[in-house]
């Protein structure tokens, strides 16, 4: 969620009571920044707290070494149960990197040589001309449908966690907004 439109960050125009309450009771990342403009290096930097040059992921085709320590490993060692729902875009055979459970995976395979599913009119969304957006027109995209699955799984997980009444770490990876 954009910091500029959240009550917990001082916006007085929008009403975000659920986010405000979560921020009051949880951890808020006030000084976070993106370590790379590219998806995989940025996400792996977030997991390791290391710049791309240190964790050795420079492109979307690079993968984080399975033995690279992440803050999720530390949470697991402290007795928490880190969960991931949805997109993380971890390339390579290790899709967990310290997460103990993953309910919904990425939108497509993240390992070279594995065929990706057909995205229909979304194929080529990253093209600078945005041809797929023109072809797609109004309506639901495959990314929106994926996000619906992720959102439903997240609601179920939060309900379960509330019943268990325990500290938790839940990472939710949505597709949208995304390219272009």
Predicted regions and their residues:
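Formylglycine-dependent sulfatase
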Residues: 1-180
